[in-house]
Each structure stands twice: as C-alpha cells, then as structure tokens.
Amino acid sequence: MKNVCGLDVHKDSIFMCIIKENGDKIEEKFGVLTPELDRLRDLLVYHSVGDIAMESTSIYWIPIWRVLYSDFNIKLVNPYFIKQLPGRKSDVKDAHWIATVLQKELIKGSFIPEPIIQELRLYDRRIFYLNRSLQRAEQNIDLILQRCNIRLSNYVSDIGGKSMQKVIDSIIEGKTDPDILLLLVHKRTRNKHGDEVIKAALTGVISKTDRMMLKLSREETCMYERQIEECYVEMNSICQTHFSQEIELLQTIPGIKKDSAMRIVAEIGVDMKAFITASAIVGWAGLKPRNDESAGKIKGRKTLHGNKFLRVLLVQCAWAACRTKGSRFFYKYQTLTKRMNHNKALLANARKILVIIWNILSKKQPFTTTYIAA
C-alpha cells in the first residue's frame, strides 16, 4: 500500500486528508491561491504521497491539477461514483472518504488529456459556445425583420446565408426598395418561389430604430464569426505542429473535413491507450445504449450521458456522411430509417464513425472508403 491523499475541492478552499500505509491520518485545510497550492505540494512531497484523488468540481480542480500533475499520480473522479455514506457529510469527512476509496482502489480516474490537447480543447469549446451565440444573434435578426414584416426567412434555407446577409446589409444602409432587395436574393430562391412572392416577402415597414437594431445585431454576428475564425487559425497552428498526420488520417472518413478533424482531436486526443476498446470510447462519448434490465425485462435503451461536445460534433459529421451518396454511411442510414426515426439513425452512424476514428488513431492507418455504385 502507498501513502494516498484525498482532496475535497471548493471555490475558495481545499480540504486535504493523507492516509499513510500504517493507517495514520493527516488532515489540513488550504486556500486556493498559488502560494497555498505550493505549500500543499510541498506537504505531499514531504509525506511521500504517491497517489492523489479529487472530485471534478466545476473548473476549480484545474489550477490544482496544473500545480501537482508533474509530481504525483492524480485521479480526477466523477462525484457521482464516490458518493459519501448518508450521515457523514462534511468537508473533512469527504476528503477522508476520497482517500479511503483511493487506497482501496475502488475508484477509476476520468480521462484527462495531455496539456497540448487541453489547449486545443479550450479553442474547441470556445467555438462550440460561439456557434450557439451566433445562432441566437441570427435568430434575433430574423425577429427584427419579422417585426418589420420582411419574411424572406420563410423562403430561404439558412437565415445566416449570403442572400439574407446581403438583404440585411442593404436595409441597414437605408435601401429598402423591394425591387432593389429582390436583385440581392439568389436566383435559385427566386426561381423556386417566383419573383412576385419574394418581392412581397421583402416589402415591409422599416423604421430608423429598426435599422439601428439590425446594425447592432449584424455587428454582433460579425464579431462571433471573426472570433470563430481566430480560434480555428490557432487550432490549425497547433495541429500542424503536433498532429498533422492524425488530422490527415481523420479526413479520409466521409463527412469529416479539416475543421471537424481538429475538433475531434481536441476532445479525444490522439493516444487511444486511454480507451482500451472502441466500446470504451463509445460509452465515454455517450453513444452507447445503457443496460437497464430487471427480472429479465429490458426497461430502456436510452444512450448514456457523455461528452456533449464530441457527441454533437459526431452527429453533425454523421449527417454529412449520410448525404455522401455511395458511401457505406449513406446506405446504412437508408437502411436504418426504414425501421427507426431520423435521429436514431443519425446517432447509430455517429457511433459507427467514432469506432472508425478509434481504429484509425490506434493503428495509424487511413480509412478505406468503399463507394458503391448507385
């Protein structure tokens, strides 16, 4: 047995409990400022602590990890899996409980990638939230146009598309004549619905205040788009230096382009030793049906909670792959939709893509794309 340590992490305090091989306990409270973290590290070194465990409390564990990970074997644990016994809830007892289950080897650490992957993750997740904000800003622009009875969004597939942007920019400049706005709409949209219908959709009542609201919202969307592009530039720089081979290999899969490949690497890394089997990474991503069985009856097969960032990204890639005619994903999707709904078929393809990704990164071999003649 080794000397082990359990840390109960809070926003402004850390409760530490060391359990030695002979059963002795050392308990102490620390602050969260860097000098306090250095003092914690020195104390752990002094007592020859080998293994440390702490709960994944918000982002408060990250500074502690950065100070300690180079000197100790640290396990970051999901609080759900190490719940304390009823009636024993206090900060000191929590730290002691974490140390106890660590000493008895009853816990498994979460997947924490190497520092360079963590940097990529910061960009990836920033992109995730920027895309959400961009969608909200575009929806707000459409609400302003609807208030002015400009109904172009009823006839275009993408409210963030070029036709909408050109029309919005023209309205902001004060050009509200429907005949002028009509010329800015893509010919395909005009041919599909007719010039008279599109012209009527562009006829509205627009005030000076409406134009100002459009201008402010348009500047907001431009800011989000610029920041997303900056994040991709930084990610590309890191990937070209460290993961160029893996990025090229991932792009051999239908539905995965360079931007998606970089974001996948940001979430799972390139070393698949952390996931013993493809099934392990599928479960970690939340793409594996759960096993809810009692008395021989299956109660449910809903997918587990997992990495939402990776899951959303893989579903987007799966949708692109399913529309690649001739690919195995296209025919799998067509087959599955005959007996299940669209979303379940997409999720099944997302799982298939993740299994392929695991094999590609494990074997460092490209995906052999087999296209079937239509």
Regions found by a protein language model. Name each.
Residues 1-374:
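A detector of single, family-specific signature residues
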